[in-house]
């Protein structure tokens, strides 16, 4: 929806289950937010998240002292380790038109030896994320490598920083008629392909 002066929806919140609004009503949700859509302060431990915002914005604050707004192609990598609290709110900054949010969040369970590692937070700004273009294929490399492209330095104590890990996170856009073959995973690894039409 359009935003108001508090970056919340410029629409009635009547009839919504504020604090737990996961029903798509009028084309949007509040999630756990009561004034601004999103997820107020909450704890995590023992895993890491990779948050990819293709459209819209996320306001992040955490117990490590990090705070800021990211979006429009930026990626946030957070290793919760022994524990971190954070909030992820989705400000509706456009007051004259609808605010679209297109966000993917991937959770990785850390291996036993890293579950109590120090928490870590890293931003991958969209202009720093490697992009490989070839034959109607545009591939953004968040983690791993593909052909001549390699990801930016991964966070420490992350699946992406382990030399024995086959972790790859790629955002692939194909032109009509383009063909891309998913590279074979190393023995003992799995690949997951999520197709999304935006």
Report residues per predicted region:
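N-terminal, Lys/Arg-enriched amphipathic/low-complexity engagement segments
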Residues: 1-51
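A generic local secondary-structure boundary/capping motif
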Residues: 66, 90-97, 128-131, 158-161
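"Short basic amphipathic alpha-helical interaction patches in structured regions
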Residues: 64-72, 90-93, 120-123
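Short helix/loop capping segments that flank catalytic or ligand/cofactor-binding pockets
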Residues: 61-62, 79, 86-88, 115-118, ...
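Conserved, well-structured core segments that form or line functional sites
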Residues: 102, 109-197
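Generic beta-strand structural signal
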Residues: 48, 68, 74-76, 86, ...
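Ligand-binding loop in jelly-roll beta-barrel domains
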Residues: 81-113
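Glycine- and acidic-residue-biased ligand/ion/polar-headgroup-sensing regions
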Residues: 45-65, 71-75, 81-85, 175-176, ...
């Amino acid at each position: 929806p359009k935003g108001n002066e508090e970056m919340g929806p410029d629409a009635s919140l009547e009839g919504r289950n504020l604090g737990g609004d996961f029903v798509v009503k009028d084309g949007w949700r509040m999630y756990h937010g009561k004034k601004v859509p999103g997820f107020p302060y909450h704890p995590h431990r023992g895993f890491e998240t990779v948050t990819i915002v293709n459209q819209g914005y996320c306001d992040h604050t955490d117990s490590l002292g990090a705070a800021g707004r990211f979006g429009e192609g930026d990626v946030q990598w957070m290793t919760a380790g022994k524990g971190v609290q954070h909030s992820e709110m989705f400000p509706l900054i456009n007051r004259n038109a609808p605010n679209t949010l297109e966000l993917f969040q991937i959770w990785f369970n850390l291996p036993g030896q890293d579950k109590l590692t120090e928490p870590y937070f890293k931003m991958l700004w969209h202009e720093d994320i490697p992009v490989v273009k070839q034959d109607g294929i545009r591939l953004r490399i968040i983690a791993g490598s593909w052909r001549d492209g390699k990801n930016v330095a991964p966070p420490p104590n992350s699946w992406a920083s382990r030399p024995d890990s086959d972790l790859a996170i790629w955002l692939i856009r194909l032109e009509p008629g383009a063909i891309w073959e998913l590279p074979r995973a190393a023995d003992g690894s799995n690949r997951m392909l999520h197709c999304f039409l935006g």
